Amino acid sequence: CMEPDIFQKIVDASEVMTTIGGISSLSQVAGIACLEKCRYWLNGFIKQVQENRDYALERLRRMPVVCCYKPQATFVLYVDISALPMSAERFTKIAREQYKVAVVPGGATFFGPGSEGHIRICLATSHEVLEEGLNRLEQALRDLANDKVNG
């Protein structure tokens, strides 16, 4: 980075404990690209994340037992699954083990007690990967709504 003040802010921010111990790898790569490469990369990335966000919101609105609002500035969706008869942590385990889709649970461990009943979905991926993940998530939710899930 050509600007020492900006570079130091990035270094300082990376030392702050977040969900997994600092700034995510995705955020670090995006920051480097934004600061050292070309603005066109950032514009393309933002466009892709916005398209993925809009697609995911459209899909989620048709799924049972979930609620999700349009975020203003992030690469994740925070989905309310509190209508399910289980914790977010239990749901993410079922989703991962039985439906082979990974989502991050809310809860005191990472996001504070007010985040229980929510899951996070990452939008910073290809449309194809997002579509497949949403297909699997939808199947898990439909099966849970119809009591077709083991465990």
Regions found by a protein language model. Name each.
Residues 5, 108-109:
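Flexible glycine-rich beta->alpha loop in the catalytic core of nucleotide-sugar glycosyltransferases
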Residues 40, 60-69, 145-149:
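Surface-exposed helix-capping loop/turn segments at secondary-structure junctions
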Residues 32, 48-57, 68-81, 91, ...:
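Conserved glycine-rich beta-strand-loop-beta hairpin in the small C-terminal domain of fold type I
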Residues 1, 78-80, 122-124:
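Short hydrophobic/aromatic beta-strand micro-patches
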Residues 21, 64-68, 102-108:
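A short linear hydrophobic-aromatic micro-motif
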Residues 1-50, 57-59, 141:
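Conserved core segment of the aminotransferase class I/II
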Residues 94-103, 109-151:
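PLP-dependent enzyme catalytic core of the Aspartate aminotransferase-like
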